[in-house]
């Protein structure tokens, strides 16, 4: 089987900066030397900021992390590139890894909505309003808070600029409100790393209704490899079978064109059994094949669904 991967979420830029590691080779979950078995690799790379920083300090830290990541890309320009659009991606040789930039937690705007234009100009194409708790824009998954007036302004500006909203860390009210705004503007929304709440109950996981709203918007949903999202507290470590359970559940919601992978590599501490890094994801594909998933469906979940979404942006 030929392996291709379009993964919707990793936190590698932050880890590279914080731990002073290289993108080419490291002991993290994502490194260029760990993707040699993939004939194509596309990654949405999120930039997150420490929660012991103020919003303004987090904004400054964002640029440090981004600039470090860009230097890593430049140091490996024969093997990796940052893309801003499908057209830029399509021009890359297949052996060049493509990274798209995301911001995880828009608190870095620090109340200045014009900063979203700076993020767009810097290459950011995906944005989540929260990581946890409440901020000036609205509520995270662990709250019941809705969008604030400022949050609605930011969402509208993001849509107008061409930044896709990621609702993975949003409260139920925020998800509903962003979905409503997206429907009015005929824009898709995504959940880059959110599993099925009906399989494993967790406030970060999606209800059937939330998944359906994302699907109906034309968006996609990535399967997270975080243990708590896969199996809750039912066991100390998740198995590949737990990943497949969430995939199968989403497929049962008519999600064959919606479900993708959003592994959350370098953002999770405990990976599923036998999957230590991106280098091991072929084991998931092989396990799916052993459960009679067609090669076409495996390819769709690993790569094609996300690529088709990218083409529409």
Q: Which sequence ranges carry the predicted segments?
A:
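Structural preference for beta-strand elements that scaffold enzyme active sites
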Residues: 3-7, 42, 98-102, 125-126, ...
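Conserved, mostly hydrophobic/aromatic
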Residues: 9, 35, 85, 123, ...
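A metal-dependent hydrolase metal-coordination microenvironment
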Residues: 36-113, 136-152, 156-157, 167, ...
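Histidine/acidic residue-rich metal-binding segments in metalloenzymes
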Residues: 111-121, 125, 142-190, 203-217, ...
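Short acidic/histidine-rich active-site segments
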Residues: 225, 254-278
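Mid-to-C-terminal alpha-helical segments outside catalytic/metal-binding sites
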Residues: 276-313
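Active-site beta-loop-alpha junctions enriched in small/polar residues
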Residues: 9-13, 48-50, 85, 102-106, ...
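Short catalytic helix/loop segments, enriched in acidic residues and glycine
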Residues: 20-37, 283-285
């Amino acid at each position: 089987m030929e392996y291709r991967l379009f993964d919707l979420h990793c936190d590698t830029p932050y880890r590279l900066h914080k731990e002073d590691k290289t993108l080419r080779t490291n002991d993290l979950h994502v490194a260029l030397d760990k993707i040699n078995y993939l004939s194509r690799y596309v990654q949405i790379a999120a930039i997150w900021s420490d929660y012991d920083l103020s919003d303004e300090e987090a904004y400054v830290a964002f640029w440090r992390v981004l600039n470090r990541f860009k230097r890593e890309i430049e140091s490996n320009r024969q093997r990796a590139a940052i893309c801003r659009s499908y057209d830029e991606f399509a021009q890359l040789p297949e052996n060049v890894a493509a990274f798209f930039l995301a911001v995880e937690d828009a608190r870095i705007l620090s109340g200045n909505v014009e900063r979203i234009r700076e993020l767009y100009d810097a290459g950011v194409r995906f944005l989540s309003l929260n990581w946890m708790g409440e901020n000036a824009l609205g509520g995270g998954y662990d709250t019941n808070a809705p969008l604030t007036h400022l949050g609605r302004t930011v969402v509208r500006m993001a849509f107008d600029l061409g930044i896709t909203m990621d609702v993975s860390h949003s409260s139920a009210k925020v998800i509903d409100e962003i979905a409503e705004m997206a429907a009015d503007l005929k824009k898709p929304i995504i959940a880059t790393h959110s599993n099925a709440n009906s399989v494993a109950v967790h406030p970060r996981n999606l209800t059937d209704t939330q998944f359906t709203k994302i699907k109906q918007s034309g968006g996609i949903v990535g399967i997270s490899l975080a243990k708590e999202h896969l199996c809750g507290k039912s066991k100390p470590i998740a198995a590949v079978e737990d990943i497949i359970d969430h995939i199968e559940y989403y497929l049962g919601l008519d999600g064959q064109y919606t479900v993708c992978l959003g592994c959350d590599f370098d953002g999770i501490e405990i990976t599923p059994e036998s999957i230590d890094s991106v280098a091991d994801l072929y084991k998931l594909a092989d396990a799916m094949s052993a459960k009679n998933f067609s090669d076409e469906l495996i390819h769709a979940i690993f790569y094609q669904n996300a690529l088709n979404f990218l083409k529409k942006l």
